Amino acid sequence: GGMGAMGFALPAAIGATLGTGKRSIVIVGDGGFQMNIQELEVIKRRNLPIKVFIFNNASLGMVRLQQEQYNEENYVGTVKDYSAPNFKEIAAAYGIKSYEVSGMQAITDRIIESLENDESEVIDIRLTESKNQLEPRLAIDRPMEDMLPPMARDELEKLMLIKPIDV
C-alpha cells in the first residue's frame, strides 16, 4: 500500500473521470471501499464510466499487515470485529451493475468482459488466500520513496529528483 490514503480510490476515480471524460478503473480493498461507498450515487447519477474492482479479503488487509509486522498479530478491528456488507446488493440498490466472482478463471473472465464496455460496474472479487502480502509497501521507519522490497540504491538515486534520505 501507501499509494493513497484508505478510502481515496473511489473519489479519486470520480475526479479523474470528471476531469478527463475518460473511463477510470478503481482497484480497492473491501475496507477502503466502505469508507466512501456513498459515492456510488454520484457514479450512477452522472452516469460515469467507472469500473470498481474490490479485492475482498474480508479484513482490513493493509492494517492487518501492520498488525502482523509490528503488533505481534494482535488483530483488533481488522479480522476480529470486522465485517463488510454485500457489495453486490449495495451496488444494485444504486442501480449499478454488479458482480461477485471468485476463482482465477471467473475473475479473469469478468475483468475481460467488464473492460469491453464503458458502463459503471462494481466487481466484488472474493479472495480466498489468508496470506496478506502487499508489494510494494511502506515500512514504518523508512521514507516514502524507499518502499519494500528495496530497490537497488543506484537505481533509486537515478529516479529521484532529490537525493534519497538515508536512514
Listing of model-derived features with the role each one plays in the protein:
Residues 1-167:
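Thiamine diphosphate
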